[in-house]
Amino acid sequence: MKCPFCGHPDSRVLDSRPTLDGTAIRRRRECIECGARFTTYERYELLPIIVVKKDGRRETFDRSKLLNGVLKACEKRPISYETLEKLVEEVELALQKQGSTEIPSKLIGELVMSKLRQIDQVAYVRFASVYKDFREIDQFLDIVRELKKDQEVD
């Protein structure tokens, strides 16, 4: 595999193991030219998912775009990259299980928010503020009150 650091076309596999959920193979690699180490994931390929946006536009589901959005919400939070990878994997599998190739973006956002809420409440609020397009401080207060209310019930 091509090295992402120096571009050399060859690397060797140092370690190979399945991910915890068994849906991918994680490989630790080393470039034979520059010695840099990097990780790759091998996943099965399923039917392409088309995301139907709020305005009706359609675009191919982009796993990395979803992961980047989740990473942004979790910035400077004590959440491992592996946890976020797993979250994205679970969302993608849930979308595949829908049985439809066209999925509304609203469903994706709701799935992510549901999972983030269980992982980290600050990340949940951050993601929700972008996803729901908060424009007023009261919207933040409402979601925080909702979280506090849920904590009192538990």
Curated annotation (Swiss-Prot):
Residues 49-139 form the ATP-cone domain. It comes from the Bacteria. Binds 1 zinc ion. Its cofactor is Zn(2+). A zinc finger (unnamed) spans 3-34. One of its GO terms (molecular function) is zinc ion binding. Coiled coil: none annotated. Keywords: ATP-binding, DNA-binding, Metal-binding, Nucleotide-binding, Repressor, Transcription, Transcription regulation, Zinc, Zinc-finger. GO terms for biological process: negative regulation of DNA-templated transcription. Negatively regulates transcription of bacterial ribonucleotide reductase nrd genes and operons by binding to NrdR-boxes. Belongs to the NrdR family. This is Transcriptional repressor NrdR. The gene is nrdR.
